[in-house]
Regions:
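Alpha-helical transmembrane segments in multi-pass membrane proteins
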Residues: 8, 12-13, 17, 21, ...
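Short, non-helical or kinked segments that cap or interrupt transmembrane helices
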Residues: 33-41, 102-115, 146-157
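C-terminal ends of transmembrane helices
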Residues: 21-24, 94-105, 137-146, 186-190
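Interfacial segments of multi-pass membrane proteins
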Residues: 51, 74-75, 92, 96, ...
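Helix-coil boundary and interhelical linker segments in multi-pass alpha-helical membrane proteins
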Residues: 1-11, 67-88, 119-128, 162-174
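Cytosolic, membrane-interface loops and tails of multi-pass inner-membrane proteins
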Residues: 23-56, 107, 192-204
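Loop-to-transmembrane alpha-helix initiation sites
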Residues: 126-132, 147-155, 165-179
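Multi-pass membrane catalytic core of lipid/isoprenoid biosynthesis enzymes
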Residues: 43, 49-75
Length: 204
């Protein structure tokens, strides 16, 4: 690992540790909005629900940016001697979001940050399209409820599809690191889980 690699990994982790839902709540609502939500998750959905539109947009943009910036900047510079380092740069902001250094027990799930990371990989479209496509499929065609199970199913299936479809093995490994981090966060979550349900979207 070279100095540049280490700096981008550290930068990604520290940027990921900024929880924009809490920051947005303080800016727009003068309160910690995550304290109002049942799952206490500092994510985009809770930002919209408990903080309002401006807080939600602020959180969404911040969480996308924290995933995008480290990956985009790292890939825009000189090519690393060890291409494997890209995998760790990809995973760093998501790990920071899930396990922020100042409050390890109260991080987020890393979903929006994952999408931001994959935007930073463009023109490598596979991870972004696979994750978005499967999320849409499980939300609009075969509906999996609640969101906890939908997210678990999406990340597992997206990881499998990316292994199959993405030729760049370092991007694949980065996705696997991200998926493992998100799934570990979900599995260790103490939030109360509603009854698992699968149904076709057009059937009520």
């Amino acid at each position: 690992m070279e100095v540049r690699d280490a700096l981008y990994i550290i930068f990604g982790y520290l940027l990921g540790s900024i929880l924009f839902a809490r920051l947005g709540g303080l800016i727009f609502k003068k309160t910690d909005i995550t304290a109002e939500s049942p799952d206490k998750n500092p994510g985009t959905m809770n930002a919209f629900t408990y903080g309002g539109f401006r807080c939600g947009v602020f959180t969404l943009c911040g969480d996308l940016l924290k995933g995008f910036l480290p990956v985009f900047l790292y890939r825009s510079g000189e090519l690393p001697e060890n291409p494997l380092m890209l995998s760790f740069v990809m995973a760093a902001p998501i790990l920071g979001h899930i396990l922020p250094f100042y409050d390890i027990k109260h991080g987020g799930k890393g979903i929006a940050a994952t999408f931001g990371c994959f935007l930073g990989l463009l023109p490598h479209w596979t991870p972004l399209c696979v994750l978005a496509g499967i999320f849409i499929f499980f939300s609009c065609v075969v509906k999996i409820n609640p969101n906890y199970y939908r997210t678990v199913a999406t990340y597992i299936l997206a990881a499998i599809c990316t292994v199959w479809l993405e030729p760049n093995r370092y991007i694949v490994f980065g996705f696997l690191l991200i998926a493992a981090s998100v799934l570990a966060k979900l599995f260790m979550s103490s939030e109360e889980k509603e009854h698992f349900e699968v149904k076709l979207a057009w059937k009520h």
